[in-house]
Amino acid sequence: MIDEKPPIGAEEVAEATAILQKYKAGKAALDKRLVDNELWFRMGHWKNYQNPMMEGKPQPASGWLFNSIANKHADAMDNYPAPNVLPRAADDAQTAQVLSSILPVVLEQADYEQVYSDTWWRKLKQGTGVKGVFWDPEARGGVGEIAIRPMNLLMLYWEPGVADIQASPHFFSLSMENTKQLENRWPQLKGRSASVLDVPRFLHDGGLDTTEKSVVVDWYYKKPDEAGRTLLHYCKFCNGVVLYASENDPALAGRGFYDHGKYPFVFDPLFMEEDSPAGFGYIDVMKECQTAIDRMNHAMDENVLLASKQRYVLSDTAGVNEEELADLSRDIVHVAGRLGDESFRPLQTAGLQGNSLSYRNSRIEELKEISGNRDMTQGGTAGGVTAASAIAALQEAGSKLSRDMLKSAYRAFARECYLIIDLMRQFYDEERVFRVIGPAGGREFVPFSGAALRARPMGLMGGVELGSREPVFDIVVSAEKKSTFSRLSQNETAKECYQLGFFAPQNADAALAALEIMDFEGIEKVRQRVRQNGTLAQKLTAAQMQIARFNEKLSGAEENLSTRALAKNLSGALRQLS
């Protein structure tokens, strides 16, 4: 019997490698910019940009650019996102509530805070942050779990000219791995250790030895099936050898690698560029200004050193012992003959001019203005502003650029949550238990499986099957960790509502009327609490009136009311109160 040729073999891998090389050529300019920006961030950019003025001399690199980026990263970490899942149909309300409580647990188990931080560094440095949302079948002892990883944009490739990676027919994710470890895991790689691909790398001070490493390619591609549905398939290969291919897997050949049919990568550009999913960042904008500042710093440093060191103009006929003159420890310098101003004189170096310092400071202010990293955003204030509320207001007004960046990050976070829910739907076959924080603040253990997310039959109507419906959700993102100003503002709002009597049961109607024209975060919880207080007040008033009627009856005609009837009426009043 002749073995059938697998759908993905050496020929298909060779074709994919040719496509990858074409994608690499179209991304070469971006790769060069990424490597360059990394040097700028590490303040080692003079390694690539040698200044003729600085050959053989110290190459100063001030940290204004780094400080700006570090402050923006701090803003991002102050506003760590939290998901809130909303149902689109009333039948899915319970599932949405459970998802809202377990999604933060899934993110925590995936070490999402570290992923969020690393991605923000790359977003600010490179202009684009990329996260990968995968299913790791080896996690939890083979049970499997969702994995979220920060991706290196330098090792990702897509079709040139597309603005959305989902429109690319192929997508490649590359990684460098130890060849011996690869051979131990995949024996078919033995004897095929010669790497056939070259990848761009960041520059390192000590160099990076890659002689014992091979390039592993994760190849994602979209392919229509017989019914016209677009399936996502996946192939991992190294040095021309197929390590795994979903089309070669009978369980996935007709289904696709992931049911959602999307590339499992989420791009979050800082400043968008046309016809590219990748954007540009603050380093690209601030390079020129930082270069000018560095050059001025170098010239000023040289001037200060020259001005602080005494030098002389010495004629050949002066007869001065140069060795003794240069030795500052000697108190006496011998001279042969007579010295005159024409043969020996000090060399004066002009000091720094005030306009030079002003110009350098103006370039520093320009860099701050370009990056939106003005003094007020870091707590500094102009003269005369001393009130804490005024300083906080200035900080909030100056942080609109940070809020704009956070909104784009929250949109990307919502797309990541949709991918997580899709992976739950596909792979959470067994019921799992999650420890969550309940509404009362205590621990609760919530069971959950993918069955709650899968399509359910709609039943019959008039003898006709209505088919099935898959639950669909909307995700609203809010900040889990807030800045100090946001927390103080929220606390002040709560105190004002309390002082104005919003939570007094007798003021429920007036408080609800005021809340209708107010807008602040968490207003729905406040409305719910005010309504509960109003309902409780109504029940309490009704119970008090009924008890008053009982007292009248008891005082007027005690002999006509049996003890059993009195107890029955009192118990009914207590039930109404509860």
Functional labels for PLM-detected ranges:
Residues M1-G254, G351, N355, Y359-S362:
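Extended, helix-rich architectural segments
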Residues M1-K57, E108, K123, K131, ...:
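C-terminal anchoring/interaction modules
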Residues A278, Y282-M286:
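Acidic/polar low-complexity segments with low predicted structural confidence
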